[in-house]
Amino acid sequence: MFKVKILLIGPSECGKTALANFLSDTTESIGADYSPTQGVRILEFESHNLHNGNKSSSCDVELWDCAGDFKFESCWPALMKDSNGVAVVFNPDVPSHLKEIETWYSAFISSQGLLEGQCLLIAHHKPGSGADTNRPSLAPQLNKLPLIHSNLEEEPEEVRQEFNKYLGKVMRMLSESQEREEMSIIT
């Protein structure tokens, strides 16, 4: 079974921890009092029925819920080591988040040379905010990345399905990379 390391990054108070808890089926109530993540939380779980090419498979997921505070910037290289994908979470109702995610993109995605298929933008709508599901106005480099809207109050299973599609893409890329590596050894 593949093991996939996904970083969940983005501005402070955008909903990364609530999303991580939901995706990993961690039992903490949605909408609890805000408590900022210190450094990183690593959640491990199995994800099933992922579409990896023309077959369905499973993988072990390490979801790294990374702190949104820039005081932890010195830890970022250690967090990025051996990561297979990055999901950038932001609250589209907070104008500063739209600008701040450009910094997260530069630090975590372009610096690692990740491919678009290894990345995901998640416009996370907080409970009671009323979800505008239009694509927000983003910088050109961010417009190339796939975007999903997350509303855990109204459509939680849709969020899980979209995240699982993303995991399937990452797994497929890992599988193809492994096959290429094996073929280069043989030839």
From Swiss-Prot:
The answer on whether this UniProt entry bears the keyword Nucleotide-binding reads yes
Q: Which UniProt keywords apply?
A: GTP-binding, Nucleotide-binding
Report which superkingdom the organism of origin falls in.
Eukaryota
Q: Which InterPro entries match?
A: P-loop_NTPase
> Per the similarity annotation, which family is this?
Belongs to the small GTPase superfamily. Rab family.
Supply the source organism for this entry.
Danio rerio (Zebrafish)
* Gene that produces this protein: ift22
An example GO biological process term is: intracellular protein transport
Q: Where does GTP bind?
A: 10-17, 65-69, 125-128
Its recorded name reads: Intraflagellar transport protein 22 homolog
SUPFAM superfamilies this protein is in?
A: P-loop containing nucleoside triphosphate hydrolases (SSF52540)
